[in-house]
Amino acid sequence: MAKVRAAVVGSGFGGLALAIRLQAAGCRTMLFEKRDQAGGRAYVYRDQGFTFDAGPTVITAPDCLRELFTLAGRSMDDYIELLPVNPFYRLFWEDGYRFDYSADQALIERQIEKKSQADVAGYRQFLKYSEEVFREGYEKLAHVPFLNWSSMVSVAPQLIRLKAYRSVYSMVAKHVRDPHLRQLFSFHSLLVGGNPFTTTSIYTLIHCLER
C-alpha cells in the first residue's frame, strides 16, 4: 500500500504543528511557504541593522509546543530554553499612564487600586469569569474536533451561559468602569487578530491562560 502523502500550505505555527503531527502519524508530508522563511506571525523583519519581531509577544501555552516535540520523538529542552518574563509587557497611554501586566496577582490589584479603587472588586469578578471561560472553552473544548453542525450545537448551552454572544470589550466593561482598565483587560484579542469590540467574549480566557 502506498504511503499516505499530505501537503500543508503555510508554515505559521498552525501549519508547522499540523505538518509535524502528520509526519509523526506516518504521512509523507510536504510543507509550502511563500515567504523566505517559516514562522507566520512569528516572522522577523530586518532593515538597516534593526530587527523587528512581527510577533508573538509571549508564549501562552508552552505545553502545546512540548507536545509537538514529543510526537516527533524529540525533547523541546534540547532545542529551546523558555525564560520567564516579568512583567509580560508594559502598556503605555498617550496621557502618560502605564501599567505593568504580569502573573503577579497582588501587583495587578495594587495597580488597579491606585488607578481606580472601586474597580478592584469588579476586576476580581472578571478574573473569575475568565477562569470559568478558560475551563469551559479551553480545557474542555479546545481539543474537540467540531466536524459537523450537530457537534457544534451540542456546546451551544455552555456558550450561551458564558455569554459568548457578547464582545470582549462589552464583558470587561460590565465589570470595570475606568477607561484605561477597560482597554487594558480587553486588548488581548488583538494578539490573535481580533477586534475587542466585535470578538466573542470567549477570548477573555487569554487573561487566565497566559498567567
Name each region found by the language model.
Residues 1, 30, 76, 152-156, ...:
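Detector for methionine-enriched segments
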Residues 2-4, 50-52, 152-155, 211:
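A short, structure-level motif marking secondary-structure boundaries and short turns
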Residues 3-132:
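N-terminal glycine-rich phosphate/pyrophosphate-binding loop and immediately adjacent elements
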Residues 70, 186, 204-207:
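Generic alpha-helical structural context detector
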Residues 76-77, 101, 146-147, 205-208:
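Short, intrinsically disordered/low-complexity patches at protein termini
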Residues 94-200:
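Rossmann-like flavin
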Residues 199-211:
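Residues forming anionic-ligand binding surfaces in small-molecule and nucleic-acid pockets
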